[in-house]
Amino acid sequence: MDRAVNRVVLENEEREAKNTWRLVFRIAVLLLMVMTLAISAAALVYSMGASTPRDLAGISTVISKTEDKVTSLLSSKQDVIDRIYKQVALESPLALLNTESIIMNAITSLSYQINGAANNSGCGEPVHDPDYIGGIGKELIVDDISDVTSFYPSAYQEHLNFIPAPTTGSGCTRIPSFDMSTTHYCYTHNVILSGCRDHSHSHQYLALGVLRTSATGRVFFSTLRSINLDDTQNRKSCSVSATPLGCDMLCSKVTETEEEDYKSVTPTSMVHGRLGFDGQYHEKDLDTTVLFKDWVANYPGVGGGSFIDDRVWFPVYGGLKPNSPSDTAQEGKYVIYKRYNNTCPDEQDYQIRMAKSSYKPGRFGGKRVQQAILSIKVSTSLGEDPVLTIPPNTITLMGAEGRVLTVGTSHFLYQRGSSYFSPALLYPMTVNNKTATLHSPYTFNAFTRPGSVPCQASARCPNSCITGVYTDPYPLIFHRNHTLRGVFGTMLDDEQARLNPVSAVFDNISRSRVTRVSSSSTKAAYTTSTCFKVVKTNKAYCLSIAEISNTLFGEFRIVPLLVEILKDDRV
């Protein structure tokens, strides 16, 4: 609706501007015609009565005076034209931005009052500070000319840490998931009390908050609602998404190890939950026996979901039941993606054979590990109208953790490099009638992940692997035609080990100068990144939520790393 209103306003402004210029042109032409007639008449009169050179000299005097009048009139009209241009080109856009800020502030105030009255809690729907209006979920840098790698991250900035950390040596916080809408952000992670390798019991921390600007102009994330789901349910692999009703979350309910789950014949239980703006959490079990009837194991992709067309879209992956309709539909399908300027030397037939085998790794008993996308209607009823899309393996690699993102009008699926292909992948995604279609991906050759041989960071040939680590890229730089040019992200810059986290801006081939968390021996794991802009200052920032090793309190500490995106004009 906002987009339609903006389009109407712009069309009206363009129509008014055209009418104004047309009127100015007509007045100028009319004045010139009148002056021409006056000059002609004066010349005729003088020529008829002229008898001496002095009489003829008077004609030039009249003409000169007339020219002065015309020049004076045109100058006054030029002032009008200049004022019109200033109004249309400079002042009107600023006035519109101020009006938008006023409207958003009014909506914020009304939402607090209306929601507070409705739930008797005094709590309403939160909204980011006005400084961020137009700077969230947008194409932040539109540039056809500059080298992508001339943009680079600043040093990490000190800001309010909104993520709880372990409080004992045996505590474990892992698997962060983050999503941010134009009104609020959502964050979740898993909490294990007895070490990160315990699969039997865990808590799930879920929070809702907004972006604020301090009195000194610093960015900070303000948590407004949070809950620790500490019950008998063992929620795992959760993905979160910011929706108009709060924070929607999709989790699997796990009672066994991943390997045991793939050996089973029934799908994994899943739950759709929501933390509302009133701080209350509700959830509903999905009917996986119908929705995932062809699956033996199914998990959310860990990365954030996205709200698109009144539905929330989550990444999903898992194992297909052998010879089921979904499994049969993928039989013989494969795709081979190649490294930039680094061709695999293996024979083509061998590459194809290895690519096909990569979808059925031995670790999971030869089950086909499949990518999928689950969409659920967002309404006051949870788990409403779920629809599962299984993309063809002629587009996607072996199923893996992932994230669904929306930037501007474009949608993407990030797929973790769990298989042989190391560079980060972003599949363009289109949605229609509750289902999604994926297209050939953008690849970022220098944005790699560590992995075990033969699928290490520098690998270039198809192989069967379960490796890698989740490190998603965020679309940052676009062409004017809305195609993607560059991304921001935090990668683990090592061949095989989960070491050396660095943040950078990446194009399809190379990367910018990097910002390092610490030394190259620093242990790390998952990272998820999101970028936004403070419109008031026109500064772009990126947040990388990263699992960093923590030797004293727990194995990992989840740290929100904040950078400003700078530009080196010398590049």
From Swiss-Prot:
Keyword terms: Disulfide bond, Glycoprotein, Hemagglutinin, Host cell membrane, Host membrane, Host-virus interaction, Hydrolase, Membrane, Signal-anchor, Transmembrane, Transmembrane helix, Viral attachment to host cell, Viral envelope protein, Virion, Virus entry into host cell
Coiled coil: none
Protein location: Virion membrane; Host cell membrane
One protein family per Pfam: HN
Function statement: Mediates the viral entry into the host cell together with fusion/F protein. Attaches the virus to sialic acid-containing cell receptors and thereby initiates infection. Binding of HN protein to the receptor induces a conformational change that allows the F protein to trigger virion/cell membranes fusion.
Domain comment (free text): The C-terminus (head domain) is involved in binding the cellular receptor.
The protein, known as: Hemagglutinin-neuraminidase
Phylogenetic placement of the source organism: Viruses, Riboviria, Orthornavirae, Negarnaviricota, Haploviricotina
Gene: HN
